Amino acid sequence: LECNQLIPIAHKTCPEGKNLCYKMFMVSTSTVPVKRGCIDVCPKNSALVKYVCCNTDRCN
């Protein structure tokens, strides 16, 4: 699986076991991602941050 990094033109191949791509947003600015990458399980959203996860190459 390949996931985008914070700068969308940069991407990396995920290590074994991390088979989801994610985007993390601050809830207050939910249109601008603050972090992107590979992750093993999709974290729960909280009062401050929102995660969007997907499982296809560079879908984040």
Curated annotation (Swiss-Prot):
- Domain of life assignment: Eukaryota
Task: Write down the CDD domains for this protein, in alphabetical order.
Answer: TFP_snake_toxin
Name where it mostly resides.
secreted
**PROSITE patterns (alphabetical):** SNAKE_TOXIN (PS00272)
Molecular functions per Gene Ontology? toxin activity
Positions the record marks as coiled coil are none
On tissue specificity, the annotation reads: Expressed by the venom gland.
Please report any disulfide bonds recorded for this protein chain, giving both cysteine positions: 3-21, 14-38, 42-53, 54-59
* UniProt GO cellular component terms: extracellular region; membrane; other organism cell membrane
Which keywords does this chain's UniProt record carry? Answer: Cardiotoxin, Cytolysis, Disulfide bond, Membrane, Secreted, Target cell membrane, Target membrane, Toxin
Q: Where in the cell is it found?
A: Secreted; Target cell membrane
Q: Name one GO biological process term.
A: killing of cells of another organism
**Family classification:** Belongs to the three-finger toxin family. Short-chain subfamily. Type IA cytotoxin sub-subfamily.
Q: How does it assemble?
A: Monomer in solution; Homodimer and oligomer in the presence of negatively charged lipids forming a pore with a size ranging between 20 and 30 Angstroms.
**What's its job?**
Shows cytolytic activity on many different cells by forming pore in lipid membranes. In vivo, increases heart rate or kills the animal by cardiac arrest. In addition, it binds to heparin with high affinity, interacts with Kv channel-interacting protein 1 (KCNIP1) in a calcium-independent manner, and binds to integrin alpha-V/beta-3 (ITGAV/ITGB3) with moderate affinity.
What protein name does the entry list? Cytotoxin 10
Q: Which organism is it from?
A: Naja annulifera
What lineage does the source organism belong to?
A: Eukaryota, Metazoa, Chordata, Craniata, Vertebrata
